[in-house]
Amino acid sequence: MNQAAVQLPLPGFEQASGQWRSDYSRQVAGEKPVRNRSGIEVQPLYSPRDWAGERYLDDLGFPGQYPFTRGIYPSMHRGRTWTQRQLIGLGTPQDYNVRVRRIIDAGATAISLLPCCSGFRGIDCDEVDPVLLGTCGTVVNTTDHMDAALDGVPLGTISTAMNDPSPFTLLAFTLGVARRRGIDWRSITGTSNQSDYISHFIANHQFYRLSLPGSRRVLLDHIEFCRRALPNWNPLSVVGQHMQQAGATPAETMGFTLSSAIQYAQDCIERGMDVDDVLRRFTFFFDISISFFEEIAKFRAGRRIWARIARERLGAKDPACWRFKFHGQTSGVDLTQQQPLNNIARVSVQAMAGILSGLQSMHTDAYDEAIACPSEETARIAVATQNILRDEAQLCAVIDPLGGSYYVERLTDQMEAEIEAVIARIDAAGGMYKAAEVGLVQTMIGESALAFQEQLETGERKIVGVNCYQVEEDPTIPPAERPDPEAMERHVERFKVFKRERSQDAVARALDALARAANSERENVFEKVVEAAEAGVTHGEMVGCLRRELGFGHPLIIA
């Protein structure tokens, strides 16, 4: 079957093309090459010579059809728009509850919970000066805390995302709340969207709690438990965001992320899990930078590559496993403290790139996130940005509206080649686990970060208000929203009372069972985490126990 859409030469094509190039060269004599963040040279004009559609069905196809370049579902956003999943976290569980209810009222169709930095560090609130608590996330250390945070939130109806690194205590607390409310665990939907320990080891050391092999063990146990008890929960979200925000180019980010997905899939297969059963619940989480067309091409290429990896390399038979389901967050790295209102425009461009690339859910950053955690007002503006793009700009009217653009299709092909080269390099190093363990990935990211910084310092790459178009500004930084210190002190005191009054015998038995599970290949560590949460064991106690048994998480530092 001849799939060609355009046959060259067109009548007069060469003459017209040559005339344009001559005219263009006279007007821009001495022009320097323009390159995107992945280093691909961007031409001034694209034509049928760059992409003529010869392999339309093989490389693009139709939405919902392999290789899913144009979208993973037939109707895409025309039939069902993306999920609006705003990241929320500040203060006490009661503070979170007030804000999450208002965000739902403002149009959010799913929720996320960001824990306090003390929680990310693996410790409880009574181990930290209260003035430091709740400034960058919500303090949730027990099932009671989670119950307060989710008061009135319809678990089993609304999708939840837990920013919850290993050993996934937030999910354990959530399951305890569901049991209290008589909610069937099988109805709970959402994602463990910080389960990608390799990305933490490489690029987000705050989230890194357990040793590399310990993290591997707990993740596999977590996936097995969720397959059995939580059929609608996504136990793994492979995170490219950390690596791109650390300095990886968009092409490198996609290559690293897909390499991690290959590693996790192979680990599950070696554990004896069915590949189709596992991949059906795989999801991805990415940064969306302001490099508009590059981001769109990154995601279109990523969909195509993942479909081929899942089907041909990993052997998945179910077409649902070939779908590249991803959440996008507009990039905070692109936001500036200078002239912060300009960030509203930046976030709008980033969000448009995400929508036009066909994401499944999105968080739009608030314009003040370069300064502090967003205020309630700026968070509402961020949600409204999505509503405006969807309902006023009608960006959902056409599926893959940039598909067929000579530029976008050529750039998608070029990004695909760059991404596949990264995957090949990781494969040659023995896979993503080995490549991270020896520092290859960290070195590559460092080199890209340095190159980007040099471009900023020379002015080759411009940021309005930072290295160009600077204006006199009030040097006073707007006050950051902070938790009520008295409320936080009361929260800590109640926590101390809880620890004194709970059953100490039950806690001791649960921690002993958790330690024994960590040292037994026959027991599931995450199952014991869930049981410990219901017995009143705190977040810090569970993390501390597993650190003793499986090793403390020390990331590799590359000089």
From Swiss-Prot:
Applied value in biotechnology: This enzyme and the derivative PCM-F, a variant in which the alpha and beta subunits are fused into a single polypeptide via a short 11-amino acid linker, have potential applications in bioremediation of pivalic acid found in sludge, in stereospecific synthesis of C5 carboxylic acids and alcohols, and in the production of potential commodity and specialty chemicals.
GO-annotated molecular function: cobalamin binding; methylmalonyl-CoA mutase activity; pivalyl-CoA mutase activity
GO BP: any one term: acyl-CoA metabolic process
CDD domains, A to Z: MM_CoA_mutase
UniProt keyword terms in alphabetical order: Isomerase, Plasmid
Alphabetized Pfam families for the sequence: MM_CoA_mutase
InterPro entries tied to this protein: Cbl-dep_enz_cat, MeMalonylCoA_mutase_a/b_cat, MMCoA_mutase_a_cat
Reaction(s) the record says it catalyses: 3-methylbutanoyl-CoA = 2,2-dimethylpropanoyl-CoA
EC number: 5.4.99.-
Top-level taxon of origin: Bacteria
Keyword Iron-sulfur in annotation: no
UniProt xrefs under NCBIfam families: acid_CoA_mut_N (TIGR00641)
Complexes and interactors: Homodimer in the absence of the PCM small subunit. Weakly interacts with the PCM small subunit; an alpha(2)beta(2) stoichiometry seems to represent the active state of the enzyme.
Family: Belongs to the acyl-CoA mutase large subunit family.
PANTHER family on file: METHYLMALONYL-COA MUTASE, LARGE SUBUNIT (PTHR48101:SF1), METHYLMALONYL-COA MUTASE, MITOCHONDRIAL-RELATED (PTHR48101)
Chain's role: Together with Xaut_5044, catalyzes the reversible isomerization between pivalyl-CoA and isovaleryl-CoA, using radical chemistry. Does not exhibit isobutyryl-CoA mutase (ICM) activity.
Record's protein name: Pivalyl-CoA mutase large subunit
Species this protein is from: Xanthobacter autotrophicus (strain ATCC BAA-1158 / Py2)
